[in-house]
Amino acid sequence: MVTIRLQRGGAKKRPFYQVVVADSRRSRDGRFIENIGFFNPTAQGQEERLRLDLDRVEHWVGNGAGLSDRVARLVKDAQKAAA
């Protein structure tokens, strides 16, 4: 099954996540199909916290992709911000 989930990057104690479409059988930081955004949980000041390509999220969900719990909350936040 294809899932939309977070892929961890950044430095020790400074996480930075890419939002990716990946096969659920792959490892967390392994190969992915498409990068559709990022999430910076430690953003401060003017730094951008979240960027998602909502059109691509809708495309993948329409084609049967599942969302991880955290990504589902992030998509909901992004939709609120876009409205």
UniProtKB/Swiss-Prot annotation:
Gene Ontology CC terms: cytoplasm; small ribosomal subunit
One GO molecular-function entry: structural constituent of ribosome
Disulphide bonds in the chain: none
Pfam families xref list: Ribosomal_S16
Domain of life: Bacteria
Gene Ontology biological-process annotations: translation
Keywords: Ribonucleoprotein, Ribosomal protein
UniProt cross-references to HAMAP family, sorted A to Z: Ribosomal_bS16
Family membership noted in the UniProt record: Belongs to the bacterial ribosomal protein bS16 family.
Protein name: Small ribosomal subunit protein bS16
Source organism of the structure: Pseudoalteromonas atlantica (strain T6c / ATCC BAA-1087)
